[in-house]
């Protein structure tokens, strides 16, 4: 029996009565629909009405759109739903991932680089305030993974770094601050990403920690989030073999499954050992991390049967609903388990006050998004986070008088259709700022010529006063590495002039580029590329502001030569 009076629901008598009455009035189809949190890219009323009246979905996740479209979408959904919806969004770095006009406050790693939980609290408050004004009530944040493996292609700047105590403290601060704004937070990605160098989007990855190691790291992190009152936990397609073996003695290797379908991790570890009473949601079920371990027909109902309360996204809407219905019919999901999951979904809604009608966008949402205090917070985070990792004496500052002629090497990857990846145009924006500051900027273009036919080195050493690398390479789904791919021929754009021309390397995203450019003597990490970050970076390079951040990870990647 779920204790609805206990944290994180903490319901009063009216809330409990609403949960019990609503559950009792539901038929099987309504209960089935509540299990699903679907994605919406559109504000089309007909489609949205189908989600609420036809499928009875429990929630949706908004993808990138304008503030007006987001408000219209939420209004349509909530006004047509019999049971109010959970409106979720990926709020990593800010509501700007979902709403174009919102403030990008800064990545988790930028917040960690400030060394201040006060910055975390203020950032989460801004994010929550903007999201709630738009009718968003469920934040798919914070990421509380620990970035222990610099080769991991998906955690990176999304995390609070590599120190478990820091991640625990900042994750808990984030949870308290954003939930104080009326949203449910979601600590992710249980049982913990950042250990494997592979991406759970593309396979079932492995957290290789022993039971003791996990307890002393991720265990500390999740206990802190739970103590802070986190309402939901998102479970990834990540295996934790040591704990699966400890909790299921004799389990065969082939039967060790990722967290999202591992009953021993969801119930024995998360519920019983860690004491989590809130809602458990799967990570996206469209990921190969789930598809690679079970056929879809089995995987869909197993997610709920194993202990997740909500099923995130579908591969094929009709097919997945059919698989879930079959799982209920065939007893894979028992009536008791179905009611337990739906009860937690309804309890989460009641804990947010949705049963009282506090679920529509605010009339003054545009004013909230334009609040100058929010942009001021973003500036303070940027000013406190940009990190001078490595410095060659005498190279900085960069001024027009010292370096009139600058050769820029830009290293970039693109964004994805769903808004992930590096911010397009960041390098161009920074180059424009250099030109405006009076520098004569040349952007490197690879030329022809193999051995014996390349341009003379004096073309660089005598024509340029500074070499500046601008790397805008970020983590994104479906990418197995976040490394530099050099140009032909023969690495035409590698740092070949570090002994001849002052060279500065700036990474807008990935903090681990020293692994590929160990001989670069001056390197700066910014952990983001928003206009505010670029403006702050330029001021620091010019000597007008300090480099105030401290690296939350080993930017030297454990290598001796990166210190040269």
Swiss-Prot record:
Optimum pH is 7.3 with 4'-nitrophenyl beta-D-glucopyranoside as substrate. Precipitates below pH 6 and stable from pH 6.8 to 8.4. InterPro entries: Glyco_hydro_3_AS, Glyco_hydro_3_C_sf, Glyco_hydro_3_N, Glyco_hydro_3_N_sf, Glycoside_hydrolase_SF, NagZ_Beta-hexosaminidase. Pfam families: Glyco_hydro_3. GO terms for molecular function: beta-glucosidase activity; beta-N-acetylhexosaminidase activity. One of its GO terms (biological process) is peptidoglycan turnover. Its EC number is 3.2.1.21, 3.2.1.52. Belongs to the glycosyl hydrolase 3 family. This is Beta-N-acetylglucosaminidase/beta-glucosidase.
């Amino acid at each position: 029996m779920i204790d609805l009076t206990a944290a994180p629901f903490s319901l009063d008598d009216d809330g409990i009565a609403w949960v019990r009455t609503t559950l009792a009035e539901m038929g099987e189809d309504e209960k089935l629909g509540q299990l699903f949190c679907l994605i919406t890219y559109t504000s089309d009323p007909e489609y949205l009405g189908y989600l609420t009246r036809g499928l009875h979905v429990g929630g949706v996740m908004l993808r990138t759109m304008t503030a007006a479209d987001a408000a219209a979408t939420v209004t349509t959904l909530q006004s047509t739903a019999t049971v109010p919806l959970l409106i979720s969004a990926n709020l990593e770095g800010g509501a700007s991932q979902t709403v174009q006009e919102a403030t990008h406050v800064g990545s988790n790693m930028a917040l960690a680089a400030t060394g201040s939980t006060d910055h975390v609290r203020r950032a989460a408050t801004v994010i929550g305030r903007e999201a709630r004004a738009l009718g968003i009530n469920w934040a798919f944040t914070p990421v509380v993974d620990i970035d222990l493996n610099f080769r991991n292609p998906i955690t990176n700047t999304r995390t609070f770094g590599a120190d478990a105590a820091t991640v625990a403290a900042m994750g808990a601060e984030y949870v308290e601050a954003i939930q104080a704004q009326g949203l449910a937070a979601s600590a992710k990605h249980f049982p913990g990403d950042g250990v494997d160098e592979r991406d759970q989007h593309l396979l079932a990855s492995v957290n290789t920690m022993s039971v003791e190691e996990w307890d002393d790291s991720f265990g500390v992190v999740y206990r802190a989030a739970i103590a802070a009152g986190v309402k939901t936990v998102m479970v990834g397609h990540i295996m934790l073999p040591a704990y699966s073996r400890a909790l299921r003695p004799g389990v065969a290797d082939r039967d060790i499954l990722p967290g999202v379908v591992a009953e021993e991790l969801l119930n024995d570890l998360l519920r019983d050992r860690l004491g989590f009473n809130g809602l458990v949601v799967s990570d996206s079920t469209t990921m190969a991390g789930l598809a690679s371990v079970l056929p879809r027909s089995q995987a869909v109902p197993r997610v709920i049967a194993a202990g997740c309360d909500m099923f995130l996204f579908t591969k094929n809407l009709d097919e997945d609903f059919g698989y879930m219905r079959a799982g209920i019919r065939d007893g894979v999901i028992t009536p008791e388990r179905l009611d337990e999951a739906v009860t937690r979904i309804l309890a989460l809604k009641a804990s947010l006050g949705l049963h009282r009608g506090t679920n529509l966008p605010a009339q003054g949402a545009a004013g909230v998004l334009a609040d100058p205090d929010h942009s001021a917070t973003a500036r303070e985070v940027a000013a406190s986070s940009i990190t001078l990792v490595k410095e060659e004496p005498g190279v900085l500052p960069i001024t027009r008088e010292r370096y009139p002629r600058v050769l820029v090497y830009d290293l970039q990857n693109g964004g994805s259709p769903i808004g992930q990846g590096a911010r397009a145009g960041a390098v161009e924006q920074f180059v424009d700022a250099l030109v405006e500051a009076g520098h004569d900027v040349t952007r490197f273009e690879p030329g022809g010529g193999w051995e014996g036919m390349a341009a003379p080195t004096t073309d660089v050493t005598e024509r340029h006063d500074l070499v500046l690398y601008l790397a805008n390479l970020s983590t994104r789904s479906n990418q197995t590495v976040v490394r530099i791919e050099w140009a032909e021929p023969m690495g035409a754009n590698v740092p070949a002039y570090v002994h001849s021309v002052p060279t500065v390397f700036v990474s807008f995203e990935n903090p681990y580029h020293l692994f590929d450019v160990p001989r670069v003597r001056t390197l700066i990490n910014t952990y983001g590329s928003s206009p505010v970050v670029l403006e702050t970076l330029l001021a620091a390079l010019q000597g007008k502001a300090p480099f105030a951040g401290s690296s939350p990870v080993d930017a030297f990647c454990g290598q001796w030569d990166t210190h040269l």
